[in-house]
């Protein structure tokens, strides 16, 4: 098994507490509402929404994949850190065991820096193609922008 690690950063004008509430704590409700092309729905398969919870995310028509299962590995509401793993779904195929993510929101000039670390755990000595990672980063950046625009248009939400 190989492990490949990738890091990325995005910036947002939304401060970490508000962005964390929207993007992490209420994502299962918010994202299908504002970005149905990305996520159709989310359901808890096992757990109570905390660490260890497994969710099935039904992806939207804009995705080339149909679903993924997320396992929540950690939620730190005080430091705005969220970690989870994609453990199943057509997005990981038969060459990847899981993809683990850590997302950290850091305050910066009234907004946030979103720091994301991805660990691809492969089956055997498979190499992850750069275009696969780049496409994932672009989807994530696009989703952050949709959430940011929603929060700017609805400043009363997630205070």
Swiss-Prot record:
Which family does the similarity line name? Belongs to the BetVI family.
Q: Does the keyword ATP-binding apply?
A: no
Task of the protein: Involved in the control of flavonoid biosynthesis in fruits, probably by binding directly to natural flavonoids. Binds the natural flavonoid catechin with affinities in the low micromolar range.
What species is given as this protein's source? Fragaria ananassa
| Gene responsible for this protein | FRAA3
Expression by tissue, per the entry, reads: Highly expressed in open flowers. Expressed in roots, leaves and flower buds. Expressed at low levels in ripe red fruits.
Name the UniProt record assigns to this protein: Major strawberry allergen Fra a 1-3
- Which PROSITE patterns is this protein grouped with? PATHOGENESIS_BETVI
What assembly does the database describe for this protein?
A: Monomer. Interacts with AP.
**GO-annotated molecular function:** abscisic acid binding; protein phosphatase inhibitor activity; signaling receptor activity
Tell me the superkingdom of the source: Eukaryota
* More info: Fruits silencing FRAA3 exhibit loss of pigmentation in mature fruits due to the lack of anthocyanin biosynthesis.
